[in-house]
């Protein structure tokens, strides 16, 4: 018999169980959870305890670290602890720089965006898809009606649950409020069910974004072609400084010289030895 809701709410994670679970989270996806986050972790994992019919967190640890447990439960664990908060048109200064500076430089001066030199953009840590779809809108608008502007968008995240929503591309109507009205008419579809206040990204835009799973902790990201633009925003804040440096070095390996890296406005590369020059706040170019 599964545990009752009352039992689960009364159950408290022991310091030892927290150490085991936070250590696993750190090694699996780089996220550091200080002891102050124990209550948060308890809250997020209670749903998994209910689903598995487990009475307490000690039993969950036994299951997670059992033979086959890591493979079966590891994905769910990551989904529970990763934060997928994002928005359309988040940090709009980045998109202004993208269209006014970065794209003209890359296309007009360096020739990217032609059929032979397709412009490659990577949304690293894309969560539920708002960022890559925003990028697709700006890139489509930058190219205008021209059929000669060629680009691709790679969007990656560690959370399979977030990627499922991103591929589905269905959002609450409130989420698209930052999108300009003319763009809504071009790129968004209203639900046919008037009782559902939902929108979906139009097929034309969905076809421009390729989603796949990627763990920043992996040594090899399996990205064959160098990218001209990388957006990795509000990801580094979850890592400690050594992990940030390791991840940024891997990102730089996949960024073409002269390409642009965009990070979140609460993040900094100050003091890190990287082949990047700052060209605006939180915007860098590979040297």
Please place each PLM-identified region on the residue numbering.
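Conserved beta-strand signature within the Rossmann-like core of class I S-adenosyl-L-methionine
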Residues: 258-265
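Conserved AdoMet
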Residues: 2-120, 264
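Conserved class I S-adenosyl-L-methionine
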Residues: 116-129, 154
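A short glycine-rich, Lys/Arg-flanked "PGG" loop and its adjoining helix->strand segment in the class I
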Residues: 245-257
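Extended basic-aromatic, gly/pro-enriched interface segments that bind polyanionic ligands
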Residues: 124, 145-231, 235-243, 268-270
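Conserved SAM-binding loop of SAM-dependent methyltransferases across substrates and taxa
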Residues: 128-146
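Core SAM-dependent methyltransferase catalytic element
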Residues: 229, 270-287
């Amino acid at each position: 018999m599964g545990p009752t809701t009352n039992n689960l709410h009364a159950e408290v994670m022991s310091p030892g169980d927290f150490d085991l679970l936070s250590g696993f989270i750190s090694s699996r996806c780089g996220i550091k959870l200080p002891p102050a986050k124990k209550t948060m972790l308890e809250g997020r994992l209670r749903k998994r305890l209910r689903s598995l019919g487990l009475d307490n967190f000690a039993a969950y640890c036994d299951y997670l670290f059992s033979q086959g447990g890591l493979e079966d439960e590891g994905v769910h664990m990551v989904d529970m602890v990763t934060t997928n908060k994002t928005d359309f048109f988040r940090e709009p200064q980045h998109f202004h720089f993208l269209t006014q500076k970065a794209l003209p430089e890359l296309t007009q001066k360096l020739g990217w965006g032609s059929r032979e030199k397709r412009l490659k953009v990577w949304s690293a840590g894309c969560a539920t898809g708002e960022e890559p779809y925003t990028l697709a809108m700006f890139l489509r608008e930058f190219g205008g009606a021209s059929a000669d502007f060629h680009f691709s968008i790679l969007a990656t995240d560690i959370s399979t649950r977030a990627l499922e929503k991103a591929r589905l591309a269905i959002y609450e109507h409130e989420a698209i409020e930052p999108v300009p009205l003319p763009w809504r008419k071009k790129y968004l579809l209203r639900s046919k069910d008037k009782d559902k206040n939902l929108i979906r990204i139009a097929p034309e835009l969905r076809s421009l974004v390729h989603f796949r799973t990627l763990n920043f902790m992996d040594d090899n990201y399996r990205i064959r072609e160098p990218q001209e633009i990388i957006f990795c925003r509000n990801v580094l804040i979850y890592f400690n400084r050594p992990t940030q440096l390791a991840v940024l070095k891997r990102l730089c390996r996949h960024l073409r010289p002269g390409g642009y890296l965009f990070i979140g406005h609460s993040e900094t590369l100050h003091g890190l030895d990287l082949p990047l020059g700052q060209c605006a706040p939180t915007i860098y170019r590979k040297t």
